[in-house]
Design a protein with these regions (language model features):
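Alpha-helix-centered segments that form part of catalytic cores
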Residues: 448-455, 462-467, 562-575
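Repeat-blade elements of multi-bladed beta-propeller folds
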Residues: 42-45, 83-102, 106, 132-161, ...
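Bacterial N-terminal signal peptides
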Residues: 11-25
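Segments forming glycine/polar-rich beta-alpha architectures that bind adenosine-containing cofactors
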Residues: 454-455, 459-493, 498-500
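Mature N-terminal segment immediately following signal peptide/propeptide cleavage
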Residues: 30-78, 89-92, 576-577
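N-terminal pre-domain segments of enzymes
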Residues: 26-58, 402-434, 516-519, 532-553, ...
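Extracytoplasmic/lumenal domain signature
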Residues: 63-76, 107-131, 147-149, 162-199, ...
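Bacterial N-terminal signal peptides that target proteins for export
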Residues: 1-15
């Protein structure tokens, strides 16, 4: 292999090209646009509409069990230390895969048949990346072609730079921006418009840019907001750039400025002293209508909003804007005055449905709160009524909750939205049920997904129990032919508690934590682990809970609700659902994942037959849909009788939910699966990793191909 170092200013670009791999047949860029119809996977979500759907059906329910590992690619050497949270979904264009990996967020091009490295690229951004709010390898790359041989791979670095590379060899597209780079920190602000520092300013993104026609659209994200030092954080924004030149085309402010619609929903001019409210997940686009759909996150901070009275538009809203101008067309706010971290965490799904004989161009948004919100994507009108209903009110000093919240009437919730004491408490045995009820006396248990956080105390009430997380960042999938959405959901409830922060830590009155417990700063996944980041000191362990109580909820406010080491609620703990959008009805729902080992082998359950429980963490694994099956991997490692310890990649019949196949993986799924075809052979690729297993891409195919292991630097 040959190596070239390109000096491009402050960051250093490294491109490694496998010369032997540059074969004309593999890298020829023929006229025509990539499409799943041609066996490609040209977008993170397969298409611009977010469906994660491919019409390929060589691999199906009758042969899924026969899949073998065709090749594998370890990402250990794409950075100075291995990555254990590989979340990428590769793109497949004419037999070449493009994706990110490693702690330096390197871009790699791989031969789709063998996994052999064609080229790699990375930027060495130093401190700027080391302190970035969204670290590790991100979710992948984007692709653009003019159909005439100008083919580009586009990604956002850890340090928030937009970079374009020539798809053929990984070299920088020097005509884009400045020598191939647009500095996305330029234009980001906090306060009333103060520019952030280009090195230390807090902003980034780990999702892929939306690329449509000659426009590339990029969102923004800040550090996770459970225990942050200030509410006056960097403000979220969405921007569109000319894909050829890098010229800024438009900006949409997710926290409206004075004179912009929605500014008055930040009472007491609180727009000027609050931040976040970015679009950190995938953006979807209707190219024909010229409309862009922006799923907006929570403002600073996640669980306390006393410093931002009002409904806080466009926080936790779906916003539709014009592709050419960025002008708002319509919006719908899912949560008024957000306090539950119910940010819109995944791509809106664009489907053409038929309701009562009426054709509707729809947008469907799965959510953390287990509702699919469905709208006419042209007008923003809900397809079925969404009702404003009274919700519990906060008793936290300084907090002012919205008196009502939107409740969709259809489709029904596809996951557990709160803990119902009358039917949800663990009941494997009468003894465990009684212990569960006793433990819950230490919590405020509401019958609403909108039970607000409360001040928690180790010696009193530990927290308020509400919804956990249904669908998270990997997002759901949809079949554009049958109009069915396939949505995953975690089913464990969450406890949320607040505490005054230690002196000097934050200007926010209350942050996540418990009075009487050692304060712990909450770090997001991967925070501290960028290529050049120094290791953070280990936080002190929390003290044990009071005798007889359930364990203390973590500082982030989620989980921790157990009895004798078992979840405090009845199974299933993770589910996969099919939702018919023509009818607004649940077609089927099944547990996802084998029963965890700690439940299957628990001494208090000895001799009992435990039905398949599904797995916690299902909200954090993605899925894909093909002509006949839904494919999704396990979020946990298990070792049931009859197979070695590991996780399974599973296929479900689309019509019934019956599992029709499963293949073994050495680690849990950590990204989202995709599929493509090369020379008439279909492959499925999924990212795996976690725990002690570093990130790896696994490629599966039917028998007939060889198995090969590649790793950059090996």
């Amino acid at each position: 292999m040959s190596r070239r170092f390109l000096r491009i200013g402050p960051p250093i670009a490294l491109v490694i090209i496998g010369l032997a791999s540059l074969t004309p047949g593999l890298l020829s860029q023929n006229t025509g646009l990539p499409s799943t119809r041609n066996g490609d996977w040209p977008h993170y979500t397969a298409d611009l509409k977010g469906t994660r759907y491919s019409p390929l059906d060589q691999i199906n329910g009758t042969n899924f069990n026969q899949l073998e590992v065709a090749w594998r690619f370890k990402t250990d050497n794409l950075g100075p230390r291995p990555e254990y949270k590989l979340e990428g979904t590769p793109l497949a264009i004419k037999g070449v895969l493009y994706t990110t990996g490693g702690t330096r967020r390197s871009v790699v091009a791989l031969d789709g048949k063998t996994g052999e490295v064609i080229w790699t690229h990375s930027l060495r951004e130093g401190r700027r990346a080391a302190i970035a709010p969204r670290q590790l390898s991100g979710r992948g790359v984007s692709y653009w072609t003019d159909g005439k041989g100008d083919d580009r791979v586009i990604y956002v670095t850890t340090g928030y730079r937009l970079v374009e590379l020539h798809a053929k060899n990984g070299a920088m597209v020097t005509s884009f921006g400045k020598d191939g780079i647009v500095d996305l920190k330029v234009g980001a602000v906090k306060g009333k418009g103060e520019a952030i520092d280009l090195e230390t300013g807090e902003i980034g993104v780990h999702s892929t840019a939306a690329v449509v026609k000659d426009i590339v659209i990029v969102g923004s994200s800040m550090r996770e907001g459970a225990t942050v030092p200030t509410h006056n954080n960097t403000k979220g924004l969405v921007r569109a750039f000319d894909v050829r030149t890098g010229k800024l085309l438009w900006t949409f402010n997710t926290i409206p400025k004075p004179g912009e619609f929605g500014n008055d929903t930040w009472e007491n001019e609180s727009w000027a002293v609050n931040g976040n409210t970015g679009v950190w997940t995938q953006i979807t686009v209707d190219e024909d209508l010229g409309l862009v759909y922006l799923p907006v996150e929570t403002p600073t901070s996640d669980y306390y909003g006393g410093h931002r009275p009002g409904n806080n538009l466009f926080a936790e809203s779906l916003v539709c804007v014009d592709l050419k101008t960025g002008q708002r067309k319509w919006y719908f706010q899912f949560v008024h005055h957000p306090l539950w971290n119910f940010d819109n965490s995944s791509a809106p799904l664009l489907l053409d449905i038929n309701v009562n004989g009426k054709a509707i161009k729809a947008v469907a948004s799965p959510s953390k709160q287990a509702w699919v919100y469905v709208f006419d994507r042209v007008t923003g009108q809900p397809v079925w009524p969404i009702e404003e209903r009274p919700v519990p009110q906060s008793d936290v000093p300084g907090e002012k909750t919205s008196p009502t919240q939107p409740f969709p009437t259809k489709p029904p919730a596809y996951g557990r939205q709160y803990l119902d004491i009358t039917k949800d408490v663990i009941d494997f045995t009468p003894e465990l049920h009684a212990q569960g009820l006793e433990a819950l006396k230490r919590y405020r248990v509401g019958n609403s997904p909108f039970t607000p956080p409360m001040l928690g105390d180790v010696n009193g009430i530990l927290g308020a129990i509400g919804a956990g997380t249904a669908t998270n960042w990997p997002g759901s999938a949809a079949d554009p032919e049958t109009h069915v959405v396939y949505a995953q959901a975690g089913n464990l409830p969450s406890a949320r508690s607040l505490v005054a922060p230690p002196a000097g830590f934050s200007d926010i009155r209350y942050v996540s934590g418990l009075a009487g417990q050692q304060f712990r700063e909450v770090l997001g996944p991967g925070d501290c682990c960028a290529a050049d980041a120094p290791p953070r000191p280990t936080a002190p362990a929390a003290p044990p809970p009071p005798s007889g109580a359930a364990p203390n909820p973590p500082a982030a406010g989620g989980g921790g609700l157990t009895v004798q080491g078992l979840p405090i609620v009845r199974p299933p703990y993770g589910v996969l659902s099919a939702i018919d959008l023509d009818k607004g009805e649940l077609m089927w729902q099944v547990p996802h994942g084998d029963t965890p080992d700690n439940i299957r082998t628990h001494p208090m359950l000895a001799g009992m037959t435990i039905p398949k429980t599904g797995q916690a963490g299902t909200s954090g694994v993605g899925l894909m849909v093909t002509k006949t099956v839904v494919v999704m991997g396990d979020p946990q490692i298990t070792a049931p009788p009859g197979r070695q310890r590991g996780a399974m990649l599973r296929a479900y019949d689309k019509k019934t939910g019956q599992q029709v196949g499963a293949v073994w993986m050495p680690a849990p799924q950590s990204g989202s699966p995709m599929t493509y075809s090369v020379d008439g052979k279909q492959y499925i690729i999924v990212a795996i990793g976690g725990g002690a297993y570093s990130g790896e891409y696994l490629a599966f195919s039917l028998p007939g191909g060889g198995t090969r292991t590649t790793s950059q630097g090996q």
